[in-house]
Amino acid sequence: VSLELGEAAAGAGPGLNEAPEALMQANVDFKQLVEGAGDAIMVCDAMGAITLWNRAAERIFGFGEAEALGQSLDLIIPQRQRQRHWEGYHKTMETGVTRYGADLLRVPALHKDGRTLSIAFTVSMLFSADREVTGIVAIVRDETARFAEERKLRARLVEVEATTIREGDSR
């Protein structure tokens, strides 16, 4: 493909010879951006098959790229969440609109080893040049540790409040 682009650019006039190099550099830059991101970047096609899965997704969910590509999102969606997820997903693919916009969503997810994770993510629709929906991209962060810490802090707050109330009642 690069050779064909080079030949086309060579015959198209001055200044276009740089186009293949610029395109290749943009591709390299994109790959570096995706692979260097600390958050998981996942792309799914209109049917819900995973088409992009970066290193952070591997780290967060435990599935390697080869294990994830081509698979359904059921790979990481807990059983009890699947029906609701797929109803929303298919409606979004049909309409081209996500009801969440740029909202940060928080849901449970599955790790390869069976653990339940707490993840936060945003989604964005993907469209072809003719504005047909081609899929969706999600940027995902593992918030399991933070969520567990918040749970401990809330439990500790309940303990402190209960102790304070008991001490107040005994006076």
Regions found by a protein language model. Give the residues of each.
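PAS-family sensory domains
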Residues: V1-G6, N17, E132-D142
